[in-house]
């Protein structure tokens, strides 16, 4: 039996993107056992993966600070011996813990995030498609002598209980078999990545004019939930999912959708990892950085028309404040044009429904 230790603590989308790689590594290496260091909230991403153990460090108490990180190293070392350590996060915390492992004689392999080439793209605005994050993860395993070929979605699984709960809810909201089930995820962590609720209202109206559809609203914290409740009131066929279900149930529900329309956000990743058609809307960030919806056609990436802005992309993750009062890049994406694109792409068609 071979054991390896893998680190990826955050963020939500980045942790989700480890799933295709870890699942495939486990599938193709029957003797391998993986311990993944991550956060408890992300546990549903890894449901059903055999020989995978999740470990949740207590970074607020027991494993806080330098002494705490050394304690984390000691706690993890007791779970070994590990053949190798794979750091898919490469931040100060993981660098410290992996340093202790390296000093104890355990080989450590760290992700190459491509920071220099990403920063060069921001500085020069010369756009090219960089390696996808999942491939960077796979390459890190390759450094450790574990080759992996990422397969096709769906990658994320869910429990029977989550499926039954989600299916019951969804079918209760769908009046007819040939009704489109569309997920909407209007929010992201930063303003330059948000299209705006008024645009979504207009898009809902346009779709309702020509299609039988039901819309399900995903994502958002406490502040965003209040805004999503207002969006829910826009039409009787719009239903708020966020805040009502567990993450496992949301994953199961996403899998049943015909289409997800999302920002550059974790729900974009969850939908594409679930094998659902995913339309992603990009403003201040850019899919070329390697965080695009995995397995989705380039045509599904909605971006501002070229030639109007010289400031895009402004940052890798959208954390840099926009130089304009409101993100001009998002204002250039019109609901009418997005609707036309959906029609052209032929994505407004419901999947066959089995009773």
Name the predicted role of every residue range:
Residues 1-355:
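Catalytic machinery of carbohydrate-active enzymes
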